[in-house]
Amino acid sequence: MRYDGNIQQIYNPPTPAGLITVINNYLGTPVAERWFRRGERYKALAYEFYQRGLYPEACFFAQQAAEFLLNGRLIEATGSRPYTHSIYHLVKMLFEALGAELEEGVARCAKYLTEQYIGSRYPDARMLDYDRWDAEQCIKCLEEVWRSVEKTLS
């Protein structure tokens, strides 16, 4: 693809559905399925780190689990995924693609998880260290987003 000067082309490059088909054929496992599997592993890691008292890691993997689930569902629904780490934007795009209404609680949780992308990765990104309450909120929000997505698809 040739760059035409449109900055959006860099941040949200087109991913034609045909490319997903080529990748599926090459990898042997559907791309969406690969996103789901990794999302499930990250969800398990979020719980594991929470149980071990590793709260920043629990929040990091909760955010990642939601991101991977949503990317997989977007690929499944539309044939592509946007280039963003915003759980809020991903869930909003998915619900729009499905013609479903995004509940306020899910939107709030998606925004909360989005904030964890930077805060949980870098020790100097937050004023306060992560604690048990933070990790519980991350896990609750992951469960809320996950449950809402699966309910909407069923």
What do the PLM-derived regions correspond to, one by one?
Residues 2-154:
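Terminal alpha-helical segments
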